[in-house]
């Protein structure tokens, strides 16, 4: 069994954990949040809020993997203490529209981080994404965290990764609510140094490239149905 460099935060991957103990961290709070976003009865407000919390909690996990520095501080008691702090803020990037709630959660962990946005629309016949908007800051030599709700076929996130890689970042980390095995393999085949943090993994992609059991279209569930054409 291939040892994925993936941090999967759900007990579903027990078989993976035996081969690679470092990739499995059981988090009941994430399981509860994934249950909420899977539930078809969850309204838009609570769906967005759950995704926001998933983004925040996954980013706290990412924080443990980032470079740190030790900073000394003198307290009001005229005594000094030393604490480990993140060496520098990463650049946060998300894919519109579905990734916006997760980005909001990520910004709670890194409120001063630079942020970038990518607009993509998937062709439902070819399953390929057309890039409609690129608005990202300079990421040269920096750690970049890319968030999207779903890692399904991996097409959209792979396109996002390739855009970021043109600037030679120091590190790329993916944060997803739900990831499919096929998408994970595709990303790591492209770049095995990428780390993937996911709250859940699903085993199946249907004929339309949607994750099963999945949760539906994250953008539509967050903000309502969009018109296919104007």
Set out the residue ranges of the language-model regions.
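Sec-dependent signal peptide recognition
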Residues: 2-9
